[in-house]
A protein has these predicted regions:
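Carbohydrate transferase catalytic cores enriched for Leloir-type hexosyltransferases
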Residues: 1-157
Length: 157
């Protein structure tokens, strides 16, 4: 199976969302050694935590070309790239999916960790809350499956 991931957090976040991404991928690699894992990310921070995924045999890091800025690529370019890479499944590891997976008939999973921008709106700028909300709503509407990491998140979503 060819599984694609929005791996931005895996390579650039070294707390909750990044740890979740790396732990999930470790489990996939251990339990399904025949699968190929395509790690889509706009940039890679090469650290002790990320080096294993850069060099691992069944992982391939995929970055945008020069024409696509990172955020634009993650939202509007990944579905096309996933189709080109003939992926069997796309996993949005943190609240969002690229636009166009459904049109390309690529099944998807999105992991929802929380909806903190709703729970604690005072901690977020209005524009950020709007963007997070739009991305999360889109992902939950179009995902083949939604993973909520807790019962509380399940209720909130």
């Amino acid at each position: 199976m060819r599984i694609a991931y929005d791996a931005k957090r895996l390579f650039n976040n070294f707390t909750g969302l990044g740890n979740y991404s790396r732990t999930l991928l470790d489990g996939q690699l251990k339990n399904y050694p025949e699968d190929l894992h395509l790690l889509y990310t706009p940039k890679v921070r090469a650290t002790e935590q990320t080096q294993p995924y850069i060099r691992r045999n069944r992982c391939r890091v995929v970055r945008p070309g020069a024409l696509f800025p990172g955020g634009f690529w993650r939202t509007f370019g990944l579905a096309g790239r996933a189709a080109k890479d003939r992926v069997d499944l796309f996993h949005g590891l943190s609240h969002e999916l690229p636009i166009g997976l459904v049109r390309r008939r690529i099944p998807s999973v999105v992991t929802m960790h929380d909806v903190a921008w709703h729970t604690f709106p005072q901690m977020y700028h209005a524009i950020d809350r709007r963007i997070y909300d739009l991305k999360a709503r889109y992902a939950c509407r179009y995902a083949t499956r939604i993973v909520a990491i807790s019962e509380s998140t399940k209720r909130d979503v």
